[in-house]
Design a protein with these regions (language model features):
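Conserved N-terminal phosphate-binding loop of PLP-dependent enzymes in the Aspartate aminotransferase
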Residues: 1-196
C-alpha cells in the first residue's frame, strides 16, 4: 500500500522568518494532494493515536527501552560513547574501539577520509548493524548523515517485551564479539569504491 501523508507544524514567528519574504523563502511544499485514500488513512492514524491503549503501549515501551539502553551502556561503557534520544526515538553512538583498525585507517590516504575519528565511529556502527542483520535477523539503520554516526534505535509499535529483550541480548552479544574481520572487509570495499 501507500501512505503519502505529510504535515508541517510551525509557530508564526518561525513561519514568518522562513517564508515571510519572497526573496529568502525555501518553500516547503508537497506533491501529495487530492488523494482521498490518504485522507482516510490519516484520519484512522489520528484515531489510533488518540486511543488510551496506544498511549499506554508507547509509554510502556519507552520506559523499557530507556532502562535497557542504560543497562547496555553501563555493561559496554568501553564500546558505547553515548546514548541519545527519548521515548521510542533513540540512537547509540559507539566508540571506535579497535586500536589495530585505528592504526590501519591512519594509513588510508587523507583525501579519501576527511575525519578519520568520525569515520571509525561510523564504521563501527555500520559493522554492528551488519552483524545484527546477518547473525540475528535484526534490521537496524545508521543515521546517513555526514554529521552523525549513530545506530538508530526506534522500534515499531507492534513489538513486545520479548522482542525488546531479543534485540538487546543480540546487540550485547555483537558488542562482546571480535568485529575486526568484518570491519576489515568493509574498509577494503570502501577503499575499492573510492579508487574506481
Amino acid at each position: 500500500g501507500k501512505s503519502s501523508i505529510s504535515c508541517l507544524v510551525i509557530d508564526d514567528k518561525t513561519y514568518d522568518s522562513a517564508y515571510g519574504k519572497l526573496n529568502n523563502t525555501f518553500l516547503h511544499t508537497t506533491t501529495y494532494n487530492g488523494f482521498g485514500e490518504e485522507t482516510v488513512t490519516a484520519l484512522e492514524a489520528l484515531n489510533i493515536l488518540s486511543e488510551p491503549e496506544f498511549k499506554n503501549k508507547v509509554n510502556q515501551l519507552s520506559d523499557l527501552l530507556s532502562k535497557k539502553l542504560t543497562i547496555l551502556k553501563d555493561n559496554h561503557s568501553d564500546k558505547i560513547e553515548e546514548v541519545k534520544g527519548t521515548g521510542l526515538l533513540n540512537g547509540i553512538i559507539f566508540k571506535s574501539y579497535s586500536s589495530s583498525l585505528a592504526e590501519m585507517v591512519e594509513k588510508i590516504p587523507i583525501n579519501l577520509i576527511k575525519n578519520k575519528s568520525f569515520f571509525l565511529k561510523k564504521l563501527t556502527a555500520t559493522v554492528i548493524s551488519a552483524e545484527l542483520y546477518e547473525k540475528y535477523n535484526i534490521l537496524t539503520s545508521i543515521n546517513d548523515s555526514e554529521n552523525s554516526n549513530h545506530l538508530n534505535i526506534s522500534p515499531s509499535l507492534i513489538i513486545g517485551n520479548k522482542d525488546v529483550d531479543y534485540f538487546f541480548s543480540s546487540l550485547s552479544a555483537v558488542l562482546k564479539s571480535n568485529l575486526n574481520l568484518k570491519t576489515l572487509d568493509l574498509i577494503f570495499n570502501f577503499i575499492k569504491s573510492k579508487l574506481k
